[in-house]
Structure formats: C-alpha cells, structure tokens
Amino acid sequence: MSTAGNGHDAGATTRVADGIARAAHWRLLGLLLERPRAGWSTEIDRLADEIDDPPLRAVVAAARGITEGEYHALLGPGAPLSPREASALGFGDPGWMFSELARFYEAFGYAPRAEDPPDHVAVEAGFVGFLELKESLAWANGDAEAAHTVAAARA
C-alpha cells in the first residue's frame, strides 16, 4: 500500500516517522545539555511538546528555571562533571579526536549552532539527532544507499 502517491509503503512511512521522533529526542537531549541562554526555555518547551516521553518531559519541566550559574556549577570548568569528550581521553590525543569530529561534522554537513566546543556532549547529542534526521530524509526520498551510509556513521 502506498501513501499519497509517493510510492512509499506503510513500513517506510513508519521508518521515517520513527527516525524523526528519534531525531527530536536527541535534539532535545542536546538542548538540555547546553548552557541556558535567552530563548532556551521556550525552545526546550516547544520541542518537548512534540515528544511522547513522559520521563524526558519531566526533565524539561525540572530544567525550565535553571540558571547559567547552576549549569556551570554542574558542567562548567572545575565542576564535578565534564561535558567534554576530551576529558575522558586520559593520555589519548585530543587533537586526533577533534580532527575526527571535524571530519564527521563536515562530511555530513553538520554545523552546530551551539557555542560549545565540538566535543561537548550537547554538540555530540545534536549530531546524533542530525544524523537521525538525515537518515529519515534519505528513507523518505527512497535513497536506501544514503540511509545506510548515515546509519553506519551513527553506529
């Protein structure tokens, strides 16, 4: 059975819709890990309205009033948690990791809007959401090869 003349069956439509839902989840997770800024609460509220995930919506409700100071106390310099992948490298080469991230971001056309460094968990979560969206778009366009390429990069 095709949908509205686009030649896609119900399974393909479900695959696209599920991918878009996963992209929204990842984007919301990324936003929740960004430093609060003007308009941030409105943005997370609007995206949460699109998500059918009560626990994640509860996190959004709890995060609404967070201040920049509270964010930095938890995830800022000298805080108990580091949001940076480089902090988990130990004696690894951060230059190599940054170049790998740059190659992936460039290869898939990802230009994060966040002011955070490329190895920040918010940026990386946003990238996963971006890949989910790209994969969904490829499936929607009937381009299985592109969809598989994006899925392999996400894995």
Give the residues covered by each predicted segment:
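Surface/interface-facing alpha-helical segments and adjacent flexible terminal/loop regions used
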Residues: 1-155
